[in-house]
Amino acid sequence: VVSQSGGVSHLVAYQALDEGVGLGKVIGLGNRCNVDFADLLPYLADDPETGCIILFMEGQDEPRPLFRALKEITPRKPVVAMKAGKYAVSLKAAQSHTGSLAGRSEIYEAALRQAGAVVVQEPQELLDVAKILSMVTPSAGRNVAVMSFQAGPGILLTDEVARQGLTMAAFSSKTQGDLNRLLPPLTIRTNPVDMAFARTEEAFEETVRLILSDENVDALVIFLLHHPFMTPGRIKAPVLRQKERSRKPILLCANSPRGLIEKEVEELEASGIPVYSFPDRTIRALAGLIRYGEVLRQTRGGAERMTR
């Protein structure tokens, strides 16, 4: 984490500790008297303990060295960036805080994207996107499949897919036919798939297999509330078996009262399945992964780091 604000660096670090996300280094630049973002990026890019770089910035007096460094580094290591000071009142506060030329956020964000950074809007999103980029191979496509055991959360996930500019995958005729035969009539068998009336581990695993095998699907998101029929512990083995057979990203959105699923979540994440607690956080993280995949697709030598 490299931040112009000591407070924000602590905010991100404390949340990372609370969520079990590893942090190698937390660096506060303040008013950047003699060290700036561009000075630190090459070091962090070559640091084997750093899987992803988080930047929080308020403004830059001379931004061109930063953008040059980002263009060189982002094909090798992901960078997630947030620019604060989006409104007139906060722009003034940013300038008085660090003495930097804050500038319009739209211009900064466009330049950051052009340089290969994944731009986010909130501190929580910094951490969520950095987590998935440290765990999952970037995806090459924007077609998302959603599975849930309740209709409402599936709709929330679908809303966020559209909000992030992603696409709900249209299953192939073969996949749709196989799902129609596998799942009972009351189940919603189109995307998003509602598994409410098919709560068996066998049906769950076969549904995951069919969806991941579909060439129209680039990533799979599974929503799960804690209940006796299907817990993160019960789906762990089926999901991990199918993960071994597919290079496509799989994300889990899971929630429960505190203390019930933490151990299972740790085990899933240790196996490369990122877990988030709310639909919006899950899809925003996936969108960040996909945007970094698009950065790699556009850079020379980046294609081999992608899922397909």
Show the residue positions of the predicted features.
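Catalytic-core regions of core metabolic enzymes
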Residues: 2-308
